[in-house]
């Protein structure tokens, strides 16, 4: 089973543009044999998702756009995983939309409703199967790893925390060389894919560097830092694939990452002469 990580940068609030880009990435990934496509967590919700959930028509417009994508890519026989914030029992919930067979399903909230009782079991990461590979989607490594069901083959981790100079793990692949993330894969004997965003959202910046670890904790695929990329990797349990050596991995240097993060922020943030309030501010519910 081939997994695709679409490390793309889009402007927050451009629902039509984001949906069009997801469709384009799905078709490109399909050409390379991918069965599952992941896109970055902030695409639809930025770094502060709660505010968008309260914006009038935002959730409706997002679901309508994604439904159109799901219908148009149905012929590809792919699954797209699109993180998004939704309203659940009166509160914003960090969820992910599963685009499959022409439909859009909010996976976490749908399964939470089925599970009923409000406890840790209710929020254990849902697991789905693609070509015999059991995949669990997680957003919070500290909390959700402890609730991970048995029998998972692949953890698809969507980075949500923006770049922080004091936390090298927010630099994704650049932290692996110093040991970050490896134990998650090797200790549990699972493949680990990190979908790292790139670009500026709200007041935050992401520096890219998506990657895939095999079930021994070795890096078998990496995307570049600070730029867009479509990373496609075959997931094969029990098969020893070629891996990258440590010297082939980027090394986190705080000064370099700070500079590149500033470059991304300047590039993605409108200048004072064209700055406008985000489109949803004028439509936010009281």
What are these regions (language model features)?
Residues 64, 88-158, 163-179, 226, ...:
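Active-site catalytic loop in hydrolytic enzyme cores
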């Amino acid at each position: 089973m081939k997994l695709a990580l679409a490390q793309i940068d889009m402007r927050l609030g451009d629902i039509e543009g984001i949906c069009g880009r997801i469709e384009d990435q799905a078709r490109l990934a399909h050409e390379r044999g991918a069965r599952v496509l992941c896109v970055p967590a902030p695409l639809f919700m930025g770094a502060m998702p709660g505010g968008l959930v309260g914006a009038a028509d935002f959730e409706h417009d997002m679901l309508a756009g994604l439904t159109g994508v799901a219908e148009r890519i149905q012929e590809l026989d792919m699954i797209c995983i699109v993180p998004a914030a939704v309203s659940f029992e009166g509160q914003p919930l960090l969820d992910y939309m599963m685009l499959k067979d022409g439909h859009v399903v909010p996976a976490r909230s749908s399964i939470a409703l089925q599970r009923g009782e409000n406890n840790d079991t209710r929020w254990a990461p849902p697991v789905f199967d693609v070509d015999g590979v059991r995949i669990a989607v997680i957003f919070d490594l500290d909390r959700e790893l402890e609730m991970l069901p048995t029998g998972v083959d692949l953890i698809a981790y969507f980075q949500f925390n923006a770049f922080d100079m004091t936390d090298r793990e927010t630099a994704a692949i650049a932290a692996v060389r110093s040991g970050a993330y490896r134990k998650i894969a090797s200790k549990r004997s699972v493949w680990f894919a990190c979908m790292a965003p790139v670009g500026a959202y709200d007041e935050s910046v992401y520096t890219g560097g998506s990657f895939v670890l095999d079930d021994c904790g070795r890096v078998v695929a990496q995307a570049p830092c600070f730029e867009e990329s479509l990373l496609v990797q075959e997931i094969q349990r029990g098969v020893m694939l070629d891996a990258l050596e440590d010297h082939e991995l980027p090394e986190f240097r705080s000064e370099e990452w700070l500079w590149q993060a500033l470059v991304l922020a300047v590039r993605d943030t409108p200048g004072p002469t064209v700055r406008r309030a985000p489109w949803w501010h004028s439509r936010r519910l009281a």
